[in-house]
Amino acid sequence: MLAQYNPDIVGGSTGTNNLLFSQDYQASQGLNYAVSGAWANTAPHQADQLVSAIKQEADWESKWKLITVQFGGNDICVASCEINPFSEYYGDATPSGWRSNMDSVLSKLSTMPRTLVVFTESYMPGKLHDMVNPSWKCRLALFVGCSCITRENLAEKTQLRDDYTAELHSLAAHYRSSDFGVEVVPALTGLYPNAPAGGPDASYLAPDCGHFNVKLHSMVIILAFQYSRWIRL
């Protein structure tokens, strides 16, 4: 979408990952260093990779940079109920753990002048429990990929998502400067589109029901772009 307005933009992805959890860089990713299936505790490392790659670009200091960041779904779905203190993400899904990781991300990104960072609020995967007549793939995906959320604790997990958002707004206010902008946009609020029979519409979801398909990705991108037009510096 942005390239339609400025064909000189560089760094955008032109392909897809081969594997859901692949962390191997592929040239088609461009400057997209996001890792599918990642938790917030991996965000600082992704930020390091991105900053290093951007600083290899010609005239990187004088060019404006737009960076979008989306985390939280996996933290709410899996990490938020982890009780094993030896787990790699134990404690990171708390509001304070979330803030610490996102603070680290912004600290690294803020080393680059002329940068706009757009955080999308975390979406609420628990709404998938309301899907009418879900396929067996959807039921399995929820059981395996989102085991922390049940109908009984949905209000608690929704509050956790809201706490994440509050921490992002606090960090955004702290890091904004004359040449470094940070904004939090509700591009994922209200997901998912409803089906005629009620509940989330599976036609907007990937086969595993835990990820977006092209239609829903397009919807989110449009919403993020609309909100981003009002970014403040």
Listing of model-derived features with the role each one plays in the protein:
Residues M1-S100:
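Conserved SGNH/GDSL esterase-like catalytic core that processes O-acyl groups on lipids
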Residues Q4, H45-D48, S52, S96, ...:
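Solvent-exposed, polar/charged alpha-helical surfaces in well-ordered, non-transmembrane soluble domains
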